[in-house]
């Protein structure tokens, strides 16, 4: 049994390296700073954890500021970063958050530690009691285009329907959404759409 576990880990590491190494090399060669980006987020029962992503923004980007609150987010996003965000490849390092137990594959996306409006609205429906996910119902039903109240309602739908079958549905729809680049709006939580 231990040898089986070891071989599975070896296969996992090799598969990840095939994806990670080219991305790491491109980020390192095209912009200053670390390849990875860590940020304090809200986990299950509102416990803090550090989420891991590929860095997609310049090192002078204001710290701990949600992208939608930046005056002009495009000026901070690197060219490589724009591609990674559009394809959701920047989220790949969160596989390690899943291995650690901080996150699930499916669940509400983890809020920044200082997103008080999102956190408080989620409190009303018990959403903060769930383990956050790599993808979730809100991600495949609007993502960046959703204002926070609508995003919370989508999270509530997931909270009320948690099941293996619903998770499989979310996973399938995520794959479709990623290929179509649905809902990717830099700086958007519905605000940009409303202004237009």
Predicted regions and their residues:
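Soluble non-cytosolic domains of exported or imported proteins
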Residues: 16, 74, 86-90, 162
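Short, glycine-rich, amphipathic interfacial segments at transmembrane boundaries or analogous
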Residues: 37-76, 134-153
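Hydrophobic structural segments characteristic of membrane proteins
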Residues: 96-196
């Amino acid at each position: 049994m231990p040898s089986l576990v070891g071989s599975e880990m070896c296969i996992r590491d090799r598969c990840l390296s095939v994806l990670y190494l080219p991305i790491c090399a491109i980020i390192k060669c095209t912009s200053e700073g670390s390849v990875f980006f860590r940020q304090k987020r809200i986990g299950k029962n509102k416990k803090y954890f550090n989420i891991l992503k590929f860095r997609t923004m310049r090192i002078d980007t204001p710290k701990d500021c949600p992208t939608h609150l930046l005056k002009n987010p495009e000026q901070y996003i690197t060219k490589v970063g724009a591609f990674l965000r559009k394809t959701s490849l920047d989220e790949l390092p969160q596989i390690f958050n899943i291995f650690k137990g901080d996150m699930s594959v499916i669940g509400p996306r983890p809020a920044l530690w200082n997103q008080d409006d999102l956190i408080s609205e989620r409190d009303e429906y018990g959403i903060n009691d769930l383990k956050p996910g790599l993808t979730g119902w809100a991600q495949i039903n609007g993502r960046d285009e959703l204002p926070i109240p609508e995003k919370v309602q989508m999270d509530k739908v997931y909270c009320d329907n948690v099941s293996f079958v619903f998770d499989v549905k979310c996973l399938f729809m995520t794959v479709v959404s990623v290929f179509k680049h649905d809902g990717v709006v830099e700086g958007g939580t519905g605000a940009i759409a409303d202004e237009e």
